[in-house]
Amino acid sequence: ASILGRNEDGTPMRKPPLLQALAQDAILADTKLIAEAWDAGGLYQVGDFPAFKRWCEWNGKYRDDMREYLKGGLWCGKYAAKRLVGSPDIYDPNIRGKDASINFITCHDGFTLYDLYSYNEKHNEANGWGNTDGGNDNRSWNCGAEGVTSDPEVLHLRKRMIKNACATLLTSRGTPMFLAGDEFCNTQFGNNNPYCQDNEISWLDWGLLKKNQDIYQFFRYMIHFRKKHPAIHGLCQPATCGLMDVSLHGVRPFEGDFGEDAKVIAAMFAGFDSKRKKDEIGRAHV
């Protein structure tokens, strides 16, 4: 969507009239406006997209930082912690609100969630460009075998990683988004740029829904869990017990551990639920 904010010579505008018109159009008042805040010309506006108090943004930094953290990357704990609690370093909640960040780990571009934990490298040979198209910065991990395998340990680990990603996404503050088919392990067979594929590579394989019911039910449970705990959304009033709206924890309470090899982040969301007339406390561990 960033291309919509450039002027005649390609210079980014501070107040693009088209984006402003869309934001202020009365007919679109009840419509969700969501921007993929970058373009093919290299303009990257995550956290700086002209929002006019209406536009939300795909948070590409959430995708990158969470992918790196979930596969065990070093020195990324402090960044993952920020993404978990709503990316306040990118979106000031007092200015942009608490739902400006569209959190995602996968989307229509790139690997599916199953492929993210099945391939270390892209496999776009079928596109006809000698595997040169598509992004190379996938931050993926094949869990011990590249692509299709019958190894039960690898298959079990892949499903664990998918559950880790799902649980992380749905307990993060912000607005969650996941790719259709991720809830039943849909695959593109390692193709991370299937724009030209109208076949089994890009189609949803609904037969996998029955095969991977455990993953499907886990997604359903996590969606229910998120709806059940409004404190995760940041929509509650301040907690009467005095707990902070959001806090991070490590080995010691209220002390986040973000060292080189930090592997666990704990966040606590708190607030007063006016509907239930009591404090609501939610916890997330990644």
Residues covered by each model-derived region:
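Active-site groove signature of glycoside hydrolases
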Residues: 1-4
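Short, flexible/disordered intra-domain loops and linkers
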Residues: 6-14
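Conserved alpha/beta catalytic core and glycan-binding cleft of carbohydrate-active enzymes
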Residues: 13-180, 184, 193-197, 230-237, ...
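A short catalytic or substrate-binding loop motif that flags glycine-/basic-rich loops and adjacent residues
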Residues: 96, 257-263
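Extended hydrophobic/aromatic segments used for targeting, binding, or gating
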Residues: 188-220
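Catalytic cores of secreted or luminal carbohydrate-active enzymes
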Residues: 209-247
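Conserved small/polar residues in nucleotide/adenosyl-binding loops
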Residues: 284-286
